[in-house]
UniProtKB/Swiss-Prot annotation:
Function: Component of the signal recognition particle (SRP) complex, a ribonucleoprotein complex that mediates the cotranslational targeting of secretory and membrane proteins to the endoplasmic reticulum (ER). Binds directly to 7SL RNA. Mediates binding of SRP54 to the SRP complex.
Naturally occurring in which organism (per UniProt): Arabidopsis thaliana
Pfam families documented for this protein: SRP19
InterPro entries the record matches: Signal_recog_particle_SRP19 (IPR002778), SRP19-like_sf (IPR036521)
Protein name: Signal recognition particle 19 kDa protein
UniProt subunit comment: Component of a signal recognition particle complex that consists of a 7SL RNA molecule of 300 nucleotides and six protein subunits: SRP72, SRP68, SRP54, SRP19, SRP14 and SRP9.
Region (Disordered): 104-145
Modified residues (N-acetylmethionine): 1
Record's compositionally biased regions (Basic and acidic residues): 104-123
Amino acid sequence: MDSGTINIKKWVVIYPVYINSKKTVAEGRRISVSKSCENPNCIEISDCCKHLKLPSAVEIDKAYPRDFMQVGRVRVQLKREDGTLLNPAITSRKHLMQKIAELVPRHPERVKKQEAQKAKKQEPQATTSTSGTSSKSGKGGKKKR
């Protein structure tokens, strides 16, 4: 390899399962449930790394070995070639995972989805309250002869 190319093979690998609060430790979660987030994806993790000013690369074609249905992973550079930290606030893999798990719930795409879901839930409630109540009783059934 010449000096112009970047070797991402030495970067830290983060699978979304590592910070997923829905998974158990046996299924691959690496941080505590209280510090993890719900169902993160590779794009959100990569955006959080950019926010932390860490270079990252998304590998969509890779799958998590324990559960091959979990597709995608992110490679993140924590240290330079000489061993110095790129972001002094993040010193280890575990600390990086905790920081990413803090940022994922505040990701703009996730916030938009949550607002859309809230609007959908409020819309049917408004329509049901304006419509009249039904006079039919709830208990029916087959009549005996």
